[in-house]
């Protein structure tokens, strides 16, 4: 064969040489250059090499396939031998065999081993089928058996014996589980009897085979379900037992509280007897059933409603007691204001009646404790408020024009006024003492002292502010009246007093001509006697002192003005005597007039002076069109100086500011008649 191959190669080489020579001749005829010839020869050489390489590769792949098949066959032979028990299987190949002959020998040996493996698998499958059946009944996992049957990795006789021993164990476990199922079913039946549940319905829900004793399922899942069912029923039993025991305790408490007759208690005797029993001791049928518990609950609810009704009555009484204490002590209790502390809160279920009763009791104790600490201060507050009421009554009394009219009970009113004045004089000290007490109480307890929801210190502060404003206003009025009295005194000293209207019906005396002429001449100021000026200035000073003394005495004594006093008795309107200027000085407006009460001038209050002096409808003002220049009159009588020139126009209006208000001066009747206005 080698010789034939060599001859074939030489023949091919001869053929290739002939073809190459023919190709060179053609190239010569064509006139190809040497470079072109070399390039063409290189291409031919490459093409030949590629053909050889392709053939070599195909032959190599064929050899590799044969080697692979032989290797696979030998590997399968080794695997079967290993799975059959680890026996060593020798190869039956001979020396000098080619690959195809070797592959044929391997295939023959492999067929024999496959037959032996199939026979072994039949024996294994019989045991595995029984294992699978018992595993399914017991609920054991079967994945490893299915995997073993599919893989067939271990078919040794030792493995077969192991599977047979597992089969025996599963058979024993099945018998034990049957006994366990019977025990669980018995326990479940007992629980269902106590709880009043349907036993057959419950086990049928777990597995239908449990009803029939011949074909009961003994799988682990069934046992677990039975165990879970028993656990749940025991928990339900414990819960119901606890509930029944709580209801029994509530029944006993309500019976003792409401004095329930013994005949009604006998109905629930079995329930009350179960208070001290344990879970295992309660075996009476249907004692923990839903219907039995519902019956006990209804009884407890009925008795609880009666109890709540009585508690509501107690709460209402407690609230009334708390309201009475709070009202007497003028305290604002938050419990009474809150909606959660009312009977409606109990009815709506927001508050527990007993809890609310305890809170009200604690609030009553708290209020009583606080009331004891507030008692002394409250007495002082009530005294202060009573004094304030007397102060208000005294102010109203002083404004009454008819307070001194003789009548029934007038002397009692006067006595009350005197007592009120004494009490009002004590108000500043009373306020200071009360403020100190309240401040100390608040600092000690850390809370505000409230009186009917208002802080007492705020009330005292407001009272102080109002009192200071009143005092300031009174002082301003006194200053105004004092200044007004001085101005009126100066006017009367210069021009005489204004005559009062004739109320007796008699014709007034005519003024002497000389006095009238002297007053007319006083317009120029040159003919006014110096003696008259001195007398009037002296009298003016006396009148001012007298008026100030009377005003001070009236202010200190706080005597009200008399009702029914005449207009002629007011300062500035007192009628002067019709005497010559040089003969007599003008009389003081505070001197008593004939036929007038002794205390009429003394008791005249500054308010009456101010009111009459400023009555715009009755006074006669000097026209301001004749004024050329206003000049302020000095406030002291000694500073009054008469004009010395007759041609100088008279300055009728006097301007004096007091607290930014104009004081308007009134003129006497003689001045009006003389033409000053």
Curated annotation (Swiss-Prot):
Positions of modified residues (Phosphoserine): 500
Pfam family, one: MAP65_ASE1
Gene Ontology MF terms in the entry: microtubule binding
Parts forming coiled coils: 49-121, 151-189, 354-383
Residues flagged as site, Microtubule binding: 406, 417
Protein origin, superkingdom: Eukaryota
Residue ranges, compositional bias (Basic and acidic residues): 606-631
Keyword Phosphoprotein assigned: yes
BP term (GO), one: cell division
GO cellular component: cytoplasm; microtubule; nucleus; spindle pole
Induction (record text): Cell cycle-regulated expression with higher levels during mitosis.
Key words of the record: Cell cycle, Cell division, Coiled coil, Cytoplasm, Cytoskeleton, Microtubule, Mitosis, Nucleus, Phosphoprotein
Ranges where the record places region Disordered: 491-511, 548-572, 592-640
Entry's localization field: Nucleus; Cytoplasm; Cytoplasm, Cytoskeleton, Spindle pole
Subunit structure, interactors included: Forms a dimer. Binds to microtubules (MT). Bundles polymerized MT via the formation of 25-nm crossbridges with centrally located endocytic MT.
Family, as annotated: Belongs to the MAP65/ASE1 family.
Role noted for this protein: Microtubule-associated protein involved in mitotic spindle formation.
Protein's name according to its UniProt entry: 65-kDa microtubule-associated protein 4
Encoding gene (name): MAP65-4
């Amino acid at each position: 064969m080698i010789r034939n191959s060599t001859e074939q190669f030489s023949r091919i080489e001869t053929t290739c040489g002939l073809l190459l020579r023919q190709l060179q001749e053609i190239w010569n005829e064509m006139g190809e250059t040497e470079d072109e010839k070399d390039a063409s020869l290189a291409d031919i050489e490459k093409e030949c090499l590629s053909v050889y390489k392709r053939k070599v590769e195909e032959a190599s792949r064929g050899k590799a396939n044969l080697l692979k098949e032989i290797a696979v066959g030998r590997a399968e032979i080794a695997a079967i031998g290993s799975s059959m028990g680890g026996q060593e299987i020798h190869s039956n190949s001979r020396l000098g065999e080619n690959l195809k002959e070797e592959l044929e020998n391997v295939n023959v040996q492999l067929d024999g081993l496959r037959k032996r493996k199939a026979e072994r698998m039949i024996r294994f499958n019989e045991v595995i089928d029984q294992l699978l059946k018992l595993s399914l009944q017991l609920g054991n996992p079967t994945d490893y058996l299915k995997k073993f049957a599919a893989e067939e990795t271990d078919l040794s006789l030792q493995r077969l014996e192991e599977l047979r021993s597992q089969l025996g164990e599963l058979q024993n476990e099945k018998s034990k589980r049957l006994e366990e199922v019977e025990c669980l079913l018995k326990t479940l039946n007992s629980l269902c009897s106590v709880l009043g549940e349907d036993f057959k319905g419950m086990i049928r829900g777990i597995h239908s085979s449990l009803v029939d004793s011949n074909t009961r399922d003994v799988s682990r899942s069934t046992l677990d379900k039975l165990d879970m069912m028993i656990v749940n029923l025991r928990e339900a039993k414990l819960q119901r037992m606890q509930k029944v025991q709580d209801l029994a305790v509530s029944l006993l408490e309500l019976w003792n509280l409401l004095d329930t007759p013994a005949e009604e208690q006998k109905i629930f005797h079995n329930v009350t007897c179960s208070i001290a029993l344990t879970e295992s001791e309660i075996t009476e049928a249907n004692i923990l059933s839903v219907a039995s518990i519902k019956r006990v609950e209804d009884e407890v609810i009925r008795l609880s409603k009666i109890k709540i009704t009585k508690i509501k009555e107690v709460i209402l009484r407690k609230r009334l007691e708390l309201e009475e204490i709070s009202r007497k002590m003028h305290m604002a209790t938050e419990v009474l204001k809150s909606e959660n502390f009312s009977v409606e809160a109990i009815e709506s279920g927001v508050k527990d009646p007993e809890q609310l009763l305890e809170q009200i009791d604690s609030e009553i104790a708290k209020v009583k404790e606080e009331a004891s600490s507030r008692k002394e201060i409250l007495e002082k507050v009530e005294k202060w408020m009573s004094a304030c009421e007397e102060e208000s009554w005294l102010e109203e009394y002083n404004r009454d024009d008819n307070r001194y009219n003789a009548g029934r009970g007038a002397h009692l009113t006067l006595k009350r006024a005197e007592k009120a004045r004494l009490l009002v004089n004590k108000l500043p000290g009373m306020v200071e003492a009360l403020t100190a007490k309240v401040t100390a109480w608040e600092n000690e307890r850390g809370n505000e002292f409230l009186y009917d929801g208002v802080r007492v210190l705020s009330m005292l502060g407001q009272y102080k502010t109002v009192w200071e404003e009143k005092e300031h206003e009174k002082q301003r009025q006194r200053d105004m009246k004092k200044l007004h009295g001085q101005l009126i005194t100066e006017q009367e000293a210069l021009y005489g007093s204004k005559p009062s209207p004739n109320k007796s019906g008699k014709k007034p005396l005519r003024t002497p001509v000389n006095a009238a002429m002297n007053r007319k001449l006083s317009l120029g100021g040159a003919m006014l006697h110096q003696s008259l000026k001195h007398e009037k200035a002296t009298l003016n000073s006396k009148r001012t002192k007298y008026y100030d003394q009377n005003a001070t005495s009236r202010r200190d004594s706080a005597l009200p003005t008399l009702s029914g006093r005449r207009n002629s008795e007011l300062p500035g309107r007192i009628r002067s005597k019709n005497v010559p200027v040089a003969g007599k000085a003008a009389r003081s407006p505070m001197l008593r007039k004939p036929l007038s009460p002794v205390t009429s001038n003394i008791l005249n209050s500054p308010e009456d002076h101010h009111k009459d002096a400023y009555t715009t409808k009755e006074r006669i003002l000097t026209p301001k069109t004749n004024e050329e220049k206003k000049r302020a009159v000095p406030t002291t009588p000694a500073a009054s100086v008469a004009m010395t020139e007759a041609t100088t126009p008279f300055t009728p209006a006097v301007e004096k500011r007091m607290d930014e208000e104009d004081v308007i001066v009134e003129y006497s009747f003689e001045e009006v008649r003389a033409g000053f206005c």
